[in-house]
Amino acid sequence: MSSNYATPLDDEVFPLSFANYQFTEHVSLGEHYSLNTSEDAKYNNLNGPFVVPRDTGKFDLNTSSASDETVFSLDNPQENNYKHQAMNNVQDCRMAVAAKTTQSCDKLTDLYANAAQQNYRLWLSSF
């Protein structure tokens, strides 16, 4: 696994990591959340599906020290403005978290969104 990808935190972590998201065994493949919304045309090229843990409706960016700033809640996607759904650069983001700033984590990029979709499809094809 590339160093740019998250590593499991424990045995319960779902064996799927893309765009540096971690998913637990509670993920339901039938429950998708698509970033392709009519409300925010700026991100209309970021097609889902993105799966989320069914029990919490939240997922954490797997930075070296996750905090409240790196939690995205599906309860209010407009307020969150999708700012933590993908990273501009994983290493920059980790350094930003270490420096107690999320400036480098606030950029949503096609690069990681597309990597997310590709890895998700690859994982599905492994069955």
From Swiss-Prot:
Inducing or repressing factors: Induced by amino acids starvation.
Mode of membrane association: Peripheral membrane protein
Location(s) in or outside the cell: Vacuole membrane
Disruption phenotype: Invasive growth defect with elongated cell morphology.
GO cellular component: fungal-type vacuole membrane
Keyword annotations: Membrane, Vacuole
Cysteine disulfide links: none
Domain of life of the native organism: Eukaryota
Note: Present with 4050 molecules/cell in log phase SD medium.
Protein task: Required for viability of cells lacking mtDNA.
Protein name, as recorded: Interacting with cytoskeleton protein 1
Organism from which the protein derives: Saccharomyces cerevisiae (strain ATCC 204508 / S288c) (Baker's yeast)
Gene that encodes the chain: ICY1
